[in-house]
């Protein structure tokens, strides 16, 4: 059986005409294809309430933390600087809960770019 790999999703923070102003959840296709090429089945995990993290982690064999917005400096005791990009605190909260659960449930974590940053903040 192929391992089920949870891939953290993202959300467009601004309305995009192509989607008629509808909020869109997504993940870059490269992560999906990479998991498939490595022999896994990808499962995109949409941003949700932190209390749902345990359920998601229980269903997957590994977690892939993807890139995206900057991690909010509030989570590591700093003030925003002039050079910070967009932040998404709801995503930060949810992904930190996913990381906490993955560690509790001894599930492997692979982190890329922002994913490595949020992993570092959580640890």
Feature-to-residue mapping (PLM):
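N-terminal beta1-alpha1 cap of cysteine-dependent amidohydrolase-like domains
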Residues: 1-112, 120-122
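Catalytic nucleophile loop
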Residues: 116
């Amino acid at each position: 059986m192929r391992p089920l790999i949870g891939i953290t999703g993202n959300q467009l923070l601004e309305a995009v005409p192509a989607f008629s102003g509808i909020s869109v959840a997504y993940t870059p296709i490269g992560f999906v294809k990479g998991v498939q090429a490595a022999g896994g089945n990808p499962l995109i995990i949409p941003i949700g309430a932190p209390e749902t993290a345990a359920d998601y982690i229980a269903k997957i064999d590994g977690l892939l933390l993807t890139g995206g917005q900057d991690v909010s400096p509030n989570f590591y005791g700093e003030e925003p600087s002039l050079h910070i990009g967009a932040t998404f605190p709801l995503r930060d909260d949810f992904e930190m809960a996913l990381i906490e659960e993955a560690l509790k449930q001894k599930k492997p974590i692979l982190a890329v770019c922002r994913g490595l940053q949020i992993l570092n903040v959580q640890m």
